[in-house]
């Protein structure tokens, strides 16, 4: 893997929570590369450091030590305004609980942040928003408030918002954690489609069925990358075999 095809490079990342005595380690020397166009899943038991890793590599939290580069930019070298802009334009986010403003429609919740993040004219951004709403099957819900749609529909709106500025990488943090099995499948179908279009995707999940969609899975234990498994490209035809392979591997790790 060369620097030119690496979207995310994390080197010797450490994170300590110094509010405790002695300090509690969150990350302990993590090295991670994500290639352009790759779908990577991060797994691990509760408290293994999955969420801490995502917060640090996305720039939402600073590491105690180590280095993070996204799109060739060193996060430590960016000022607050630059880091904020990076998170709006270079990175897309899909969280377990979608963070939308209750007084705005689905369309405006996607449109307004994008207008702040991009120099494009409103007409161009709106066209992009409408295209994404249609692509993910929620164009008929665009004028509704977030309280009027289901959890799965809201997550598809989150995916639209994550993609509207055409980011280099999308971070999905337990995006199906509060959904039923059918809706989980629909959201994962949408994320798999996003990856199929060439978008780099990093998924944090506790669900092996979701992780089986990824090309590569890394396993965190006590803040360290403990193991890694390559699955290759996902297809519907091989889904059951992939899930079985991944479950067997995870069982061997004590998951």
Residue ranges and their predicted role:
Residues 43-45:
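The feature captures the beta-strand-to-loop junction immediately N-terminal to the Walker
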Residues 66-74:
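Conserved ABC transporter NBD signature motif
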Residues 73-74, 122-141:
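Conserved ABC ATPase "signature" region
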Residues 104-113:
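Short coil-to-helix segment of the ABC ATPase nucleotide-binding domain corresponding to the Q-loop/switch region
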Residues 145-149, 153:
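Conserved ABC ATPase signature
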Residues 166:
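Conserved catalytic motifs of ABC-family nucleotide-binding domains
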